[in-house]
């Protein structure tokens, strides 16, 4: 299981962006991320075409299967979910379709129950909710 955002485990810095201009102000080793909203498909395409490491975060509590597959066409490093049910379903899709993107669940790292749910459902990894600042 990947563990991102833990203070003792080194990982890349995640930078929230809203447009291509913000991509240019990030460092090469940063991972930019943005909301998995249809209006951001162009941003995903831009990142893919320009070799920018990016992730998408799914903020809605409803399953958005179409958005999940559309964004995965642009090969994000991570698909991040705030809703565990969505993360579990996305992990099933990622496994069945051999997607390159890793599925992450955003959680409080002190939440023992969430760790157990993620392990039981073989989620690729977790990311500290404190690592993800939405502006």
Each predicted region: which residue ranges?
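Catalytic cores of alpha/beta
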Residues: 65-71, 84-93, 110-134
């Amino acid at each position: 299981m990947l563990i991102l955002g833990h203070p003792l485990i080194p990982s890349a810095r995640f930078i929230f962006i809203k447009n291509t201009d913000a991509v240019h102000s990030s460092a090469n080793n940063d991972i930019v991320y943005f909301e998995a909203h249809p209006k951001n498909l162009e941003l995903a395409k831009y990142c893919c075409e320009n070799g920018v490491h990016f992730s998408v975060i799914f903020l809605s509590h409803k399953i958005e299967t179409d958005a999940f597959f559309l964004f995965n066409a642009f090969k994000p490093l991570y698909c991040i979910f705030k809703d565990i049910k969505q993360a579990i379903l996305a992990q099933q899709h990622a496994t069945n379709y051999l997607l390159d993107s890793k599925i992450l669940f955003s959680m409080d790292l002190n939440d023992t129950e969430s760790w157990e749910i993620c392990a039981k459902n073989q989620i690729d990894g977790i990311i500290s909710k404190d690592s993800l600042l939405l502006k």
